[in-house]
Design a protein with these regions (language model features):
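Conserved serine/cysteine hydrolase catalytic core
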Residues: 210-251, 260
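An N-terminal hydrophobic leader/cap segment in hydrolases
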Residues: 1-35
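Catalytic histidine-centered segment of alpha/beta-hydrolase-like enzymes
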Residues: 264-277
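Active-site loop/oxyanion-hole signature of alpha/beta-hydrolase fold enzymes
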Residues: 83-124
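Gly/Ala-rich beta-loop-alpha elbow adjacent to hydrolase catalytic centers
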Residues: 127-135
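Conserved alpha/beta-hydrolase catalytic His-Asp/Glu region
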Residues: 158-163, 173-230
Length: 285
């Protein structure tokens, strides 16, 4: 069951917000921070690159907050304005408010409100993890120049039995460095080594945050709106939570393309940041 807050106890959000600030201190480029006030509470927005640059919107999806997406932000053309957003209701720097009732309709309105608050018209959007289905739920699909959904959750059923299941339970039960590292390695592709900042962040998520397993899947009617639009799904061939075959099936429903990343798991912003940045502007295959 999906809880009303991503945090285990009152006050835990302050620990996570502090962790986001700590990750942000390691960025080498100047970062602009602002808060958009929306129907789901305060939404934390990071921006890098020239203020006059053409914008790209990236929605953080739970595995990492916006402040943890430095490698991805640095992989885009430096002339672009990269806007990274923490979703309310997911671990990150935004409000802990989760929608009641129709989750995707509420998040779709929220995303439109954020674009309006930032005075953004039509823009390419990259949705990561759980934010993939949120990006696909935007109220007006005409606001999206190209939609890229990476390591997407909320589109197809999650795998029930997978290599990250037991490490994930151990991490939830005792989120020390050893269990956290084992869990991250199980999520990622072979040979992945998490850095210290990612380890510390994931330890805190295990200790202070609830599971996102109860997040619902996007409704068929919302998904079908994307027929004829530029949509691409990106998934690692070693992603333990999402299998490629059902993603291909749902992509075929709307004429979307699927890019399978060899040797990668589900931590694509860390495993393949350059590829993700390139896919935002690659022609649909």
């Amino acid at each position: 069951m999906l809880t009303k807050s991503p945090y285990r106890c009152p006050g835990d959000d302050s620990v996570i917000h502090h962790a986001c600030a700590g990750m942000l201190s390691h960025w080498s480029r100047p970062v602009d921070e602002q808060v958009a006030r929306t129907s789901l509470g305060e939404t934390h927005v990071l921006s890098v690159g020239p203020a006059t640059g053409r914008p790209i919107v990236v929605l953080a999806g739970g595995d990492l907050p916006a402040a943890g997406l430095r490698d991805l932000a640095d992989s885009f053309d430096p002339s672009r304005r990269v806007i990274l957003i923490d979703l309310p209701g997911l671990p990150g720097a935004s409000a802990c408010t989760r929608p009641e009732g129709n989750v995707h309709a509420a998040y779709g309105r929220w995303l439109t409100e954020v674009l309006d608050a930032l005075e953004i018209g039509v823009v390419p959007i990259l949705g990561l993890g759980w934010a993939a289905s949120v990006a696909a739920a935007i109220t007006d699909v005409e606001r999206v120049e190209k939609l890229v959904l990476a390591a997407p959750l909320g589109l197809v059923p999650r795998a029930r039995w997978h290599r990250a299941l037991i490490p994930g339970l151990q991490w939830r039960n005792e989120p020390n460095f050893e269990n956290t590292e084992r869990y991250l390695r199980a999520l990622a592709g072979s040979g992945f080594e998490p850095d210290g900042a990612t380890l510390r962040w994931s330890c805190r998520v295990g200790a202070y945050c609830t599971s996102l397993a109860g997040m619902p899947r996007i409704g068929r009617s919302l998904w079908q709106r994307w027929k004829g639009h530029a949509v691409e799904l990106v998934v690692g061939d070693q992603d333990p939570l999402v299998h490629v075959a059902p993603l291909r099936k749902i992509a075929d429903e709307i004429g979307a393309s699927v890019e399978v990343v060899e040797g990668a798991g589900r931590l694509l912003p860390l495993e393949a940041p350059t590829l993700l940045a390139e896919e935002m502007f690659a022609p649909i295959r």
